[in-house]
């Protein structure tokens, strides 16, 4: 099931968001209008971790992204394959992480290098899961990160299926920085920054000098 962003927000969240203040505009997301997902070249899962089931606790959030080409002559783009969040204790989160990794056959699991991410990193690595601890550039607060990934959206390189989980991600991003939650936003910015640093997503503005080559992809 799917609903347009504003309608979904008003009906299910009772919190319609003004588009004017958004860093990431709703219409910058490209709709994937097919029932089946595209064939993807590379899959990354991005985590924002918090270990508590208390109602007042932060959420843990997971988003899964795939690199693909919408057409044969288009540049590499990414598509949101899935996202979810919840208040899970550590054993629950570990189980969910293993299940999601196995289901999507993920190439990389990305966990921010902060205190709450360390135990999950250690446990998943013991299971043989390829975890990378990600440390955003110093001084990059959440708002700066959102601005840094906005050009990728504006260039039409980010797709989402017409599903309720995608609407939740789109709405949270459109609500930032004034929305109630930003856990999914954190997983999104982390993933796109890593894709950019790894050479998976290249913008025309990256190459002011024509002599510059395309960055080599980094698969770890």
Where are these regions (language model features)?
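ATPase catalytic-site recognition across NTP-hydrolyzing enzymes
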Residues: 1-49
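Mg2+-dependent endonuclease catalytic cores in nucleic-acid-processing enzymes, primarily RNase H-like
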Residues: 15-19, 23, 61-63, 68-176, ...
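Acidic two-metal-ion nuclease catalytic site recognized across multiple nuclease folds
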Residues: 21, 191-220
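An active-site-proximal beta-strand-loop segment
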Residues: 47-60
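Generic detector of well-ordered alpha-helical packing
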Residues: 49, 113, 183-184
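Glycine/Thr-rich phosphate-binding loops that ligate phosphate moieties of nucleotide
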Residues: 166, 170, 190, 200
């Amino acid at each position: 099931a799917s609903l347009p962003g504003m309608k979904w927000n008003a009906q299910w969240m009772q919190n319609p968001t003004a588009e004017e203040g958004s860093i990431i505009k709703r219409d910058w997301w490209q709709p994937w209008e097919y029932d089946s997902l595209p064939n993807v070249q590379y899959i990354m899962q991005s985590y924002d971790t918090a270990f508590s089931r208390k109602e007042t606790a932060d959420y843990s959030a997971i988003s899964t992204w795939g690199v693909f080409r919408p057409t044969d002559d288009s540049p590499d783009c990414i598509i949101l394959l899935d996202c979810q969040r919840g208040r899970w204790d550590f054993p629950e989160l570990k189980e969910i992480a293993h299940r999601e990794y196995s289901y999507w056959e993920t190439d990389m699991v990305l966990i921010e290098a902060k205190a709450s991410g360390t135990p999950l990193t250690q446990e998943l690595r013991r299971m043989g899961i390829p975890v990378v601890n990600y440390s955003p550039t110093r001084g990059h607060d959440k708002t700066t990160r959102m601005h840094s990934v906005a050009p990728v959206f504006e260039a039409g390189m980010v797709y989402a299926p017409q599903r309720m989980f995608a609407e939740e991600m789109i709405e949270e991003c459109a609500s930032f920085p004034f929305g109630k939650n930003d856990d999914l936003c954190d997983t999104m910015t982390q993933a796109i920054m890593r894709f950019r640093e790894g050479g998976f997503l290249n913008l025309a503005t990256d190459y002011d000098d024509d002599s510059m080559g395309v960055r080599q992809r980094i698969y770890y």
